[in-house]
Swiss-Prot record:
The modification Phosphotyrosine is found at residues 132, 822, 1140, 1165, 1354. GO terms for molecular function: cadherin binding; calmodulin binding; cell adhesion molecule binding. The 244-aa domain between residues 633 and 876 is the primary occludin (OCLN)-binding site and is required for stable association with the tight junction. Phosphorylated at tyrosine redidues in response to epidermal growth factor (EGF). This response is dependent on an intact actin microfilament system. Dephosphorylated by PTPRJ. InterPro entries: GK/Ca_channel_bsu, Guanylate_kin-like_dom, P-loop_NTPase, PDZ, PDZ_sf, SH3-like_dom_sf, SH3_domain, ZO. It is a peripheral membrane protein. Residues 149-175, 299-327, 357-377, 879-892, 998-1014, 1110-1125, 1269-1286, 1336-1347, 1403-1420, 1538-1547 have a biased composition (Basic and acidic residues). Homodimer. Forms heterodimers TJP3. Forms a heterodimer (via PDZ2 domain) with TJP2/ZO2 (via PDZ2 domain). Interacts with OCLN, CALM, claudins, CGN/cingulin, CXADR, GJA12, GJD3 and UBN1. Interacts (via ZU5 domain) with CDC42BPB and MYZAP. Interacts (via PDZ domain) with GJA1. Interacts (via PDZ domains) with ANKRD2. Interacts with POPDC1 (via the C-terminus cytoplasmic tail). Interacts with HSPA4 and KIRREL1. Interacts with DLL1. Interacts with USP53 (via the C-terminal region). Interacts (via ABR region) with F-actin. This is Tight junction protein 1.
Amino acid sequence: MSARAAAAKSTAMEETAIWEQHTVTLHRAPGFGFGIAISGGRDNPHFQSGETSIVISDVLKGGPAEGQLQENDRVAMVNGVSMDNVEHAFAVQQLRKSGKNAKITIRRKKKVQIPVSRPDPEPVSDNEEDSYDEEIHDPRSGRSGVVNRRSEKIWPRDRSASRERSLSPRSDRRSVASSQPAKPTKVTLVKSRKNEEYGLRLASHIFVKEISQDSLAARDGNIQEGDVVLKINGTVTENMSLTDAKTLIERSKGKLKMVVQRDERATLLNVPDLSDSIHSANASERDDISEIQSLASDHSGRSHDRPPRRSRSRSPDQRSEPSDHSRHSPQQPSNGSLRSRDEERISKPGAVSTPVKHADDHTPKTVEEVTVERNEKQTPSLPEPKPVYAQVGQPDVDLPVSPSDGVLPNSTHEDGILRPSMKLVKFRKGDSVGLRLAGGNDVGIFVAGVLEDSPAAKEGLEEGDQILRVNNVDFTNIIREEAVLFLLDLPKGEEVTILAQKKKDVYRRIVESDVGDSFYIRTHFEYEKESPYGLSFNKGEVFRVVDTLYNGKLGSWLAIRIGKNHKEVERGIIPNKNRAEQLASVQYTLPKTAGGDRADFWRFRGLRSSKRNLRKSREDLSAQPVQTKFPAYERVVLREAGFLRPVTIFGPIADVAREKLAREEPDIYQIAKSEPRDAGTDQRSSGIIRLHTIKQIIDQDKHALLDVTPNAVDRLNYAQWYPIVVFLNPDSKQGVKTMRMRLCPESRKSARKLYERSHKLRKNNHHLFTTTINLNSMNDGWYGALKEAIQQQQNQLVWVSEGKADGATSDDLDLHDDRLSYLSAPGSEYSMYSTDSRHTSDYEDTDTEGGAYTDQELDETLNDEVGTPPESAITRSSEPVREDSSGMHHENQTYPPYSPQAQPQPIHRIDSPGFKPASQQKAEASSPVPYLSPETNPASSTSAVNHNVNLTNVRLEEPTPAPSTSYSPQADSLRTPSTEAAHIMLRDQEPSLSSHVDPTKVYRKDPYPEEMMRQNHVLKQPAVSHPGHRPDKEPNLTYEPQLPYVEKQASRDLEQPTYRYESSSYTDQFSRNYEHRLRYEDRVPMYEEQWSYYDDKQPYPSRPPFDNQHSQDLDSRQHPEESSERGYFPRFEEPAPLSYDSRPRYEQAPRASALRHEEQPAPGYDTHGRLRPEAQPHPSAGPKPAESKQYFEQYSRSYEQVPPQGFTSRAGHFEPLHGAAAVPPLIPSSQHKPEALPSNTKPLPPPPTQTEEEEDPAMKPQSVLTRVKMFENKRSASLETKKDVNDTGSFKPPEVASKPSGAPIIGPKPTSQNQFSEHDKTLYRIPEPQKPQLKPPEDIVRSNHYDPEEDEEYYRKQLSYFDRRSFENKPPAHIAASHLSEPAKPAHSQNQSNFSSYSSKGKPPEADGVDRSFGEKRYEPIQATPPPPPLPSQYAQPSQPVTSASLHIHSKGAHGEGNSVSLDFQNSLVSKPDPPPSQNKPATFRPPNREDTAQAAFYPQKSFPDKAPVNGTEQTQKTVTPAYNRFTPKPYTSSARPFERKFESPKFNHNLLPSETAHKPDLSSKTPTSPKTLVKSHSLAQPPEFDSGVETFSIHAEKPKYQINNISTVPKAIPVSPSAVEEDEDEDGHTVVATARGIFNSNGGVLSSIETGVSIIIPQGAIPEGVEQEIYFKVCRDNSILPPLDKEKGETLLSPLVMCGPHGLKFLKPVELRLPHCDPKTWQNKCLPGDPNYLVGANCVSVLIDHF
């Protein structure tokens, strides 16, 4: 400016620059470092001049260099080392090495006026000047990547310049200047003393920098470029800022009077831009920053504009303060900032003269330049820090590290501000502004098009105009998306004032170069790409965003992934900020919802590490969310750390490493002492590490060694301390032991735990690691590598937050001393620093860490029960969460919707979700009924409630986990773990539920009627249009509502919440992929919306709308069915849905399946398959395959859903897989076994009685069952595969096998109505057959031996047929027909009406609802009574006939004795006909369906395969031999477990299978009267215990009651009681964690234990044709050889001991044994190391075996 001013003042004088050399000694200051930022270098030449000098790009105010160094000073030497022609990094390194003092020799350009005669000898001066200026500017932009930027050269510079000073004009002038003969002279004045004066008086003049063609000025001809403006409208302009001059011009109101003086030599035009210098000064926000920025600029070719911007802060503290400066300082003057500071600048125009000038000074300069630029950024309103920070030319708006210092460095471009080309346009906004925008924060916002006849066009805006400001909002550094949104958000009719500047040439270059936005972001959530062009990413990845309006549409950003060494790796699409926030919020919020327990775990895996106790960990994690404070996308800039970064070491020998470093290198490293924390500190963590403590160490120029948790690391990053996090990766457990023995023999820490925790830490928090060192136990080479790594990291540029830590300071995590409060805050994660004990201990100090390790151990212990050990919060979270969580959340939530069929992973993820929440599993166990309960309004609700209570006492933890997994077959497995307790509890509770909870109320209680509806919707959606519906809408609805359930799985069991719980589980998954879900919703909105809406209504009789699709069914068992659909019942009923999909039999099958499921659940529960998240993942994946996907998505959304139909869906027939009997039982329905099937079939009828069923306890149980199924499916894709045939047999691994007749299925807990209730719930789940859809996504579909979609379609057709034809008339028969044959069809038809649409959506919800109703009613008349109102009304008629049959399933076997699940409808009816009948009358039909479902679930597992599973299209397989019924369970082999789980009733295990067999045939044989017959048949078929277990309900007499009670009974019967399974569990001294059994035929199937995640996938053809082979397996834990399990963390068995049987069985084709392995690799390795048939997948270890 001085040059300009001088030139302006005297044309006779020529401005020349001379170079003065000064040597200064800088003393490093704690907060500032040396207080300078440098740019340039051989590798980062000035983008315009090409100068390679090292330039001071910024001088921090108040820093050591203030007053000594100035911006644009060329660094000649540092400590005697020449800086000529060196690389930027070298210069930075020299400064870093200088220690506390640095002797810097600089050359400073001094501009002097010389007579015109005196030629300016130094051509360089121009170049240098330019480069100087440019450099300065560059630094701003350049720090970010001066080299590239510079190479982008004039253009980028222009870009930034244009923002800072009008780009083209300046560059033009520059170019002109260069062309001019007189070149600037370099002048350097070096002060010998600080207070010495230069003796110069500078002035500035406004001159005409550019005249636009065809403009008034051009036409007038009296004004020429280079003219000095003396007056504007009578006001003298000397020393006037550009901003003021611009203002004067703006006020001219159409008439502008100016007095100009011609400068023939155009000296001013030839003067190199000083703006850049100033800019540069600004750019040099910090000395360190400049380096980083320049690197950043290199990093992003365009970020040169902002390079210096972020060279802020030596210490985070300083950084925050300077960051402001730097931000502004970034080269491109952040116009927004500029504006705000512009004003300041304007006040100090002279500041320009001294390069050292403050940021404000820079601002003034900017002001001049700002004419153009300033115009852009002039509006202080845009001081918006972030956009403002992004310099005009700065590619990375957020890149500038320093947030505010160079506020308006951009202003430096003030020269452009007053350009003649500028125009101020005012108009009223019409429907739109009428503008199309181009460009972005890197180049400015340009008008790409103007709508003809729009106000903007009329006012003269045209293409190529740069929008500098809109309504006082600076547009110079704003990203295009923000600009568009800002214009869109302007109210119609509001006056719009746009300051624009004509820059057609720049615009042309922008368009040609396709540049616009350029800024860097760091991701803080995990995302799975939604399209082939998308980019998936994990936390902590960095991207350069180059287009925020990809394809001209809002929603997606075009970004480039930044790989190692800051190189741009790949380009693709990522969600925009808004969507990212939603996705991230879902991921982080999920855990908070009910069922969030588990979710929290997953979500807070890293955070958890800070918590000691498993339980405490879980609670604490929920209570104090560890989720990062960072936004989904954190704007970052690459800069150098101006301070010694704290060092955090993770790994098994971290404690040793810290002590060794501090001991051997005390001058470099110091351990940060922890201070006692207020009450409640972790045992091991003596306290917290205060930020103040860290700061003190940093101020001593030492690395603070921190023993903190990953959570604390995240907080430190947020506070911008950017710790160096080194992970010492152990080579093996033994290696850890060896090293610790050698390094710290006195340590008592467990090498095993340290090793495991390290694995978990790596899995969950790898994104926090800055470097990883692989340990070699043979030597101590790690120590040298550690020191080297720390030094290397310290010298590297760091991606730092562009702005101040918004929450950091406010969060107590002040960048200053306050930060200590952040760290110290007892509640803060920082507090966990010390707590690190937990975190660290997770990996390092296992033994001493009583708390943490205890946690771990506790977790492991809990793991057995809960399946989600908190372990170290980090570990546990990471294990399940990482894979599961991300997969789960992501896939479940997002993925399933994405690829309903290709979502095996999602299923896994779902698995994970199901698996991951231990609480969910628990809830599931508890909600075996609860799930049903969600689906079974009355029973479900009631059951859920009681169940909750009981389960809570018994084994809520396990049950909770189950629910999450329960949604699919996995859920079944999941349930299995808690089956015993859950079953038992459920039995007790269910009766209670039905007695003390009105089904309706319960359903209501579901608390989320909408949610329930959603869940139902989800299930139903799947049935109706599972592909899109459930993935999207329902999942969302379901997930969120269920999430809460997850948290209170028991609760959910207790209340409809169970249902919700599922939802929550899904929500967890969903949250992760919330967006995806949304997407899905978009995909399925129509149907899902429909369903969703219906579902919303669905909670109650509202189902009728659903009736269209599933209306009747749903209504009948609105929730119950929903439960079944969503839950497991849908599975059974879902089989019908599948049937609708491909065959009606699914309806039957579902019923049967449900029954079977109930029976099997006991074993399943026993198995705890559900409980085992890992196991779940497989089923999850498995189920997902085809239908599964859709269903799964829905189910994913709602676990309940997933298990219900999702899995069933996938299996198609295999729906039974989860409720093994679900589908197969359908077939047996006709025969004795079909009777069981009828149960399944009946689940379809339940839709008619949905209202009742919703209330039905049975329904609730069904819900659980369904959930289990879902989970199982999720968990084991293979399970699903076999599901078709195997599902039937699968449900009760041991029990089923033992009780071929189906009695075992029912039998497990036929003794009590509670059990029945559970059964009902299971039955309720039967509707889950929707799951088959889930299955398809995985593999299960193939195993299922029928295409779920095919099935679905067939089922749909049949359902519609059935719905219309006998939905109302013969629900029982319908079930039977659907499940078994003709009867099933009627039932099916009934269901179908609801189911037809619903079935495609996963009829299960409806079925579930019905089942639930059944369960509840059957379970308890009382419940039945509550449900009746909703259910009966819709299903009263239809359900009447079937009710008897359905209830029969419930027979005492199911209820009382796990074994004698007694699908005896008669018994069932008899048992609880009275209460239910009244309610069930309408729902009676449905209840029978439910009962059928129960039977089907129970026996159906056997019959279902035959009927529905095997021949997905067969509707009238009611005459399935009992054997077949039994066989049906095969597909449900896995299902069986879910059943068990669902019912958590040991009793169910034993009788479930036999009863099922017996009942199924009967049921299947009967159509309208089939229920009764079935009941009788079941009675007969059922073994005595089955009978005893069955509470018979007269099918005809007590249809309503029968339905409700029946359902309750069936569900109880279906689930193999956990106790039964567990009884088996403790065999031979082994602890049987889970048991699964099922009967499979040549169609194959999947036998899975949701709880454990173990599954056997039996391919088609593995079993000879015509052979129905019962297969079982037990998952044992031999504590003597297996490490403790952290079930809470989702850690199943690290090395599961799986006992398969029967021994000696040989397969024609190898069967796949899948062992879940979420986190533990030791597990994988232990399984079958070296075996070619052994495959370690993401979530499981797969072993191929050809014999047992």
